Amino acid sequence: MRPSGDEDRARRRRRRRRRRDLLLSQLCFLASVALLLWSLSSLREQKELDLMDLVGEDRKWMMARKLMQVNDTLTSEDAGLRNSKNCTEPALHEFPNDIFTNEDRRQGAVVLHVLCAIYMFYALAIVCDDFFVPSLEKICERLHLSEDVAGATFMAAGSSAPELFTSVIGVFITKGDVGVGTIVGSAVFNILCIIGVCGLFAGQVVALSSWCLLRDSIYYTLSVIALIVFIYDEKVSWWESLVLVLMYLIYIVIMKYNACIHQCFERRTKGAGNMVNGLANNAEIDDSSNCDATVVLLKKANFHRKASVIMVDELLSAYPHQLSFSEAGLRIMITSHFPPKTRLSMASRMLINERQRLINSRAYTNGESEVAIKIPIKHTVENGTGPSSAPDRGVNGTRRDDVVAEAGNETENENEDNENDEEEEEDEDDDEGPYTPFDTPSGKLETVKWAFTWPLSFVLYFTVPNCNKPRWEKWFMVTFASSTLWIAAFSYMMVWMVTIIGYTLGIPDVIMGITFLAAGTSVPDCMASLIVARQGMGDMAVSNSIGSNVFDILIGLGLPWALQTLAVDYGSYIRLNSRGLIYSVGLLLASVFVTVFGVHLNKWQLDKKLGCGCLLLYGVFLCFSIMTEFNVFTFVNLPMCGDH
């Protein structure tokens, strides 16, 4: 049976707490990105010294043609100003004045802006994980949404809130490419870097399901193709932005009927000999197993060794086995003809018996959970065992009764261990959530973290009610509204600091979005996916990384564009400053094909080999995108205007 709602919420809270504990690794990663950007700024300054001498007459002619195309859509006054400057107005002028001058920042004050940006990344992760997402969970419960629809709507908005607000700021405030760059960079990061990190550090080979990956990848590919078509002319109209939003509504409908579509997909692929992963990578399973449910259960148990609950109901309904008299009696007593108390008791007993059968079956596999041997297994009932035939023997001649007895003892010990683990986890959940400003944790490292996050904890403690706590549970709408405001504020501060850093170092806004902003907003999701992959749930890690990209492109870009062109200034266009974005989005499309093709060649398994390949491709994407934006291959960007 599926875990209850309380167990789901407890598991999600533990996952969020573990993400918070990975603060040090997140800071180290962002520091390395900042060091990379500093190196790029040095190369940028060296290149700009003799830029006009190196480009030659052909490059000057291309720049003039670029200016003529832009001036066609500007007023005469703006065109004259743009023509006289031969540069792009920096987005820094759309923000309040900085307390430091550009010279002060070049002398070292920019480090303070880097630290502030990193702190904003962490603040966004805390607000999203501990306040925004729990409030969305409460909303989904009140609306009685299915898991698929809730995941495609509210949960996607919760995980992609920083990217969405960054895009809103890029459209309405900076009027530049920082939002588009962040969405594109975050999308590539989610596909290549997250899958690469999960493959390298999961600690095990994780099997992937073809259905989730193909479903999200196909629709994601259509979304990227639509984005390429719409931004090819460097402007987006109102109907193009509306198409993106409508495509996401279609995606929600697909998720609503995901189960029916999945069944059709399984019926088409089942004839090819695929039972679990949707492809013929399970040929090593012996044909004599006849796709028995034991195979599925054992294969699933291989990745959930410590789980106290296994979803046996769906697997047994899909792959039924011959029932004994006692089993049939238990199943009859869970129907609506009996009182609720009896139904609950019989359902619990049936699940215990099915788990007993799973453990007993594992005793005959000689440690190989990939192969199941079809031997009729006795099921323990309340006062004894069911009817049995002559004593059966295992594959090594061991008497079956002895093995069953040993397996029963192991089951009892395992259940006791699981109960103890659950009690410990429940005790830990009492202390879950963000740090409180008035309770100092124990341990030096925890104290340092508490001191580092004290200003953030102090502000959030008095402004955002924690709906995870029973006394604030009914205030989830207040939590939703206040956390949304804080996400908007932190996103504004984050984009402001990153814009200052890019202007000081001479790096275009789109590059800052593709690298620094994309990494900063996606590192928490990367850590969460790694935790999920270590638990053996590779499908969830990969599906979440690709599914969130669908939201980023269709809603993260489509919604702000639609608001600007339909509500704020009807009939206007969203203009892109950088022609290089079309190349970056093209690389994004290529990364989807390469990733799915690589997973297929790797027999739908997530391992270190696949992880290294994905990380290598991510490095290639960064290098190519940065060199393109710096006009190394062809002219795509006007230089950024200086102070004077």
Curated annotation (Swiss-Prot):
GO terms for cellular component: cell periphery; plasma membrane. Gene3D superfamilies: NCX, central ion-binding region. Its main location: membrane. It comes from the Eukaryota. It is found in: Cell membrane. Calcium, potassium:sodium antiporter that transports 1 Ca(2+) and 1 K(+) in exchange for 4 Na(+). This is Sodium/potassium/calcium exchanger 3. The lineage of its organism: Eukaryota, Metazoa, Chordata, Craniata, Vertebrata.
